[in-house]
Amino acid sequence: MDQQFLSQLEQTLHAITSGVGLKEATKTLQTQFYTQPTTLPALIHILQNGSDDSLKQLAGVEARKLVSKHWNAIDESTRASIKTSLLQTAFSEPKENVRHSNARVIASIGTEELDGNKWPDLVPNLIQTASGEDVQTRQTAIFILFSLLEDFTSSLSGHIDDFLALFSQTINDPSSLEIRSLSAQALNHVSALIEEQETINPVQAQKFAASIPSVVNVLDAVIKADDTMNAKLIFNCLNDFLLLDSQLTGNFIVDLIKLSLQIAVNSEIDEDVRVFALQFIISSLSYRKSKVSQSKLGPEITVAALKVACEEIDVDDELNNEDETGENEENTPSSSAIRLLAFASSELPPSQVASVIVEHIPAMLQSANVFERRAILLAISVAVTGSPDYILSQFDKIIPATINGLKDTEPIVKLAALKCIHQLTTDLQDEVAKFHEEYLPLIIDIIDSAKNIVIYNYATVALDGLLEFIAYDAIAKYLDPLMNKLFYMLESNESSKLRCAVVSAIGSAAFAAGSAFIPYFKTSVHYLEKFIQNCSQIEGMSEDDIELRANTFENISTMARAVRSDAFAEFAEPLVNSAYEAIKTDSARLRESGYAFIANLAKVYGENFAPFLKTILPEIFKTLELDEYQFNFDGDAEDLAAFADSANEEELQNKFTVNTGISYEKEVASAALSELALGTKEHFLPYVEQSLKVLNEQVDESYGLRETALNTIWNVVKSVLLASKVEPESYPKGIPASSYVNADVLAVIQAARETSMGNLSDEFETSMVITVMEDFANMIKQFGAIIIMDNGDSSMLEALCMQVLSVLKGTHTCQTIDIEEDVPRDEELDASETEATLQDVALEVLVSLSQALAGDFAKVFDNFRPVVFGLFQSKSKNKRSSAVGAASELALGMKEQNPFVHEMLEALVIRLTSDKSLEVRGNAAYGVGLLCEYASMDISAVYEPVLKALYELLSAADQKALAAEDDEATREIIDRAYANASGCVARMALKNSALVPLEQTVPALLAHLPLNTGFEEYNPIFELIMKLYQENSPVITNETPRIIEIFSAVFTKENDRIKLEKESTLGREENMERLKQFQTEEMKHKVIELLKYLNTTYNGIVAQNPVLAAVIA
């Protein structure tokens, strides 16, 4: 060996261990030494003979990296000499860390040699040595075997039986806990070898499964020995077990979860170990959700997590630490338990998690233990994201709990309540804001009396959330004192973080107030404009300063939507220019805010915003093409190439990061692109091709933008359709034999269609599948079958239907990616709300197709009938409800051309008359009414059982009686059930009044009017009322004063809707159509004519009502 070369290498390595000239030494190693095969024997020589242990260890680490690159370039005699000497020094080296470096080099060489059967005696000899008398020798042999298994080569498969026999013995070694831990880790890698085989050997799988209790014993031993490092390593093994084929894990997964729960709740155990246990349970929910749900472990997990969440925390840190990032990443048992509750509530049905949390509210909130009171409020705050519908149904318990929290004498409980309200408003928005009268005085009082900056901040954030969603007609009485308060808060705080929260609250007040904000608009801009001056100059600004500037942009644009174009006009151009400056800065957050500003202004100015397209769109395209992934490496291309050659997979991964800031920026830029396309219509056409090209790349390659990019693609398609004067929902019904849009428009639709369908069958991200189906459902509903087929080609329609069918059967890739072979599908388990959403959107595709295809849909539905009707029988209320609701909508789509009337009617009547869920019964009533309306066959046999069921529903004493019957019935569900039942009765009476006892039916019907939701059901109700008046039926004429009251309420709501449409913030009332009291102008005219008739017939009775007097004037 060249001694000079060896000396130079050793000196260079020494520079790294000493830290002197580190960068130069690293570059020298990469470029001058590691490219030469002779470096490998030299490094091994230093490993065995180096001057100090740190040098030896570094030489071993570097040698291991070079084995795969240079080993086969070394002559055979040198290779043989190295193998012999390494085995000798591995066992004779006194220092453990050097022994381990030596062992890993042996393992790397073994991986190279074993594949060609060039070192056949290595494994047998090590297995024999591992069974020897000397503890250190056994440990070293097992460590080498473990390192070999860790490097993973399929040539080790021939030794699986020997490994299982050895490690099943050494895992119980009485003299060394380290040997036991290494054996457990080695067994983990053996499991990968067993799985790697073409067919899993059942005997080997059984032997491995039998070793799991021994792994658990090792975990118990290392915990008792306070060996946190080994405890972590064993938990890593358990996490890997979750990914194994169920043949290898047997029935032990449930036992492992229960063991982890015991460890998690044991406060005597080291905190880090308890966190590992909680993280294991989170992993089990991720990878073995079906097993957890099937075993009904959710309640046990929830109770344990609540117990851990109640543990004492550092109160001072909680109240004064403004670092929210640190809070989210904190790994204490308490914080990990809250994260577990958050994950469990999103993965498991509400019956297993959210309902358990709600059950614990009374006891925990009344506890003398302040940490229990804090924990239950935080538990509610995380449960709402995973189970919003269930939490909404429990508002009678949850709202009082949060109010009690706000009134609590302990600041940390107040803080938890504020966090809870913030999260509730995030997920349930206007439903929470309905309680503004209870919340606002308490929150303002907390702001006024806050002694801790975190409480002040969260109180402002909670205020912000409430203000944003307070109803338009409720905000007015608060505006004047609130705006004065917010201006004062802005002036009296120097902290950018706190000012940021206040600015958001001002924006939210504007959002809620709409045109009522105009008197405060100029003053608000005066207060805020100083935060966005010299927008491009950000040098020296803190993150909070930049966030304040960005937040100000976003909220001023929200004000623009509130006060609308005329009031905003004088500020528009200078602020758009400032936003353009923001987009050109180096700050991703400022660029993001600039795009948000542009998106809002496009909403306000629509086609008038077109002049800005030529400057804004190139910046949007530039942003969308930014890399979300970064490879962090200091050096030139030559250095990078050298590093890539020598680095292992782990080192390469460590250099690779995802920039979430860029992802957020791209998401907002994509949303801005949507608004510009929809707002500027034909002015956007020159940019369509480039938009689709860039967005398609994002759907294929992006880390966090795929769903948003796909939504934007369809918004671009929509803008093209609107620009070509295609009116939504005015397309030819049925299968299109040709194209009813021009060729250019069709080409854009086809491109979007291809993108959406491209990987749908193999898509494993549930959120992406939901997005694809939502987009298809929305676009087909608005623009017809051309969205999915054209010119007689139904191949894409068939492909989409196949994917919808697989979702409804539960066999789509996104539903089976974590499927567990030993867990049968169990319909007794309620669906999680995410699963329910997936089924909902799949059914919504069918509903849209039925509307677009009308009678032609019957051919499509024939394949779906068994699955849809099968869902009627599901034990999951969510699945039953959405399936019954969808079937009812399908009846509406097919109308008189429905060949399945008898079958659908029979199935829906069973649900109406027997289902325990009010929501399901209400949905069934809707469908039964429609089927009766459109049936061409004799359906008189269903009248008696259906009317009996409807009377029971409509005659319920009050809403509380219904709520007591079905604990999950929200006010919305109750109102919807009333509307559907009323509409059903009216349709049946219109179809065959002889079969309906009108004397009893009409008073019961009128008792539930006016409707609070489901206003489309007014159509048959109004038709029935008019028909009865035409017949001069005393059943209705005797009710004339009541009819006047009802129509007065209807026109009041219609007037409110029109006022809301004119005065509320642009885009706030997205479902304005649902508030329409009359589905057509024709129906409105007919009602007005009826009112005029009643006024004449009944001595001016209608004119006496001030609302209706204006209507008939």
UniProtKB/Swiss-Prot annotation:
Coiled coil: none annotated. GO terms for biological process: mRNA transport; NLS-bearing protein import into nucleus; protein import into nucleus; regulation of pseudohyphal growth. The modification Phosphoserine is found at S646. GO terms for molecular function: nuclear import signal receptor activity; nuclear localization sequence binding; small GTPase binding. It is found in: Cytoplasm; Nucleus; Nucleus, Nuclear pore complex. Residues 25-92 form the Importin N-terminal domain. It comes from the Eukaryota. Its main location: cytoplasm. HEAT repeats lie at residues 3-35, 40-74, 92-115, 120-147, 157-191, 208-244, 252-287, 296-348, 350-384, 388-428, 430-469, 472-513, 515-558, 560-605, 607-680, 683-737, 744-783, 790-856, 859-894, 902-934, 942-991, 999-1030, 1049-1084, 1085-1110. One of its GO terms (cellular component) is cytoplasm. Keywords: Cytoplasm, mRNA transport, Nuclear pore complex, Nucleus, Phosphoprotein, Protein transport, Repeat, Translocation, Transport. Belongs to the importin beta family. Present with 38300 molecules/cell in log phase SD medium. Functions in nuclear protein import as nuclear transport receptor. Serves as receptor for nuclear localization signals (NLS) in cargo substrates. Its predominant cargo substrate seems to be ribosomal proteins. Required for import of the ribosomal assembly factor NMD3. May be involved in nuclear transport of YAP1. Mediates the nuclear import of histones H3 and H4. Mediates docking of the importin/substrate complex to the nuclear pore complex (NPC) through binding to repeat-containing nucleoporins. Interacts with Ran (GSP1); interacts specifically with the GTP-bound form of Ran (GTP-Ran), protecting it from GTP hydrolysis and nucleotide exchange. Interacts with RPL25; this interaction is dissociated by binding to Ran-GTP. Interacts with YAP1. Interacts with histones H3 and H4; via their NLS. This is Importin subunit beta-4. It comes from Saccharomyces cerevisiae (strain ATCC 204508 / S288c). The gene is KAP123.
